[in-house]
Amino acid sequence: PMQIAREILTGTRLDLISAYFSPPFAMLRRIARMGRRGRVRIITAARSDNNATIAAARHTYARLLRNGVEMYEYRPQKLHTKLVIVDDVVHIGSSNFDFRSLYLNLEVMLRIEDRAFAEQMRGYFERELADSLQITPDLHRQRASWWRRLKWTLSYFLVTTVDYTVTRRLSFGPEG
């Protein structure tokens, strides 16, 4: 995760697909900054076996949209792809863009620095984008009733803090 964070800090183009998207605030800040200086497109899940993860992702949309990030939700079926393309570098593997994947689970992401491969993977990204609904600022505002915003905020707290803390303690003990 630190390599991806460094690349996002200095990069100008990010295409990201992740079913679970609830990164820490520091990563959200980096993505928002990149949205102001370059092009950022993120595809998250519209469907999941865990609705809290969708709500947690939606909690991040307003800030990212305000900073020029393009947000999409993949609609045809459950999303399982984990893909990050920063400029000419591709990261592909098992890690979602959430606390559990970034800090708890044993995940593998293959880093490939190759312009031609990055373009091939952007072709794949474009095909997934065609099956995704763009979440515009207007659409997000229409969806964001006070009740939904509350659910999104609580879900973000649940998946970034409660789930992380409980899982960490169960896995590593109280001192872990």
For each predicted feature, which ranges?
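PLD/PLD-like phosphodiesterase catalytic module centered on the HKD motif
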Residues: 13-16, 20-176
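Secondary-structure "cap/kink" motif recognition
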Residues: 4-13
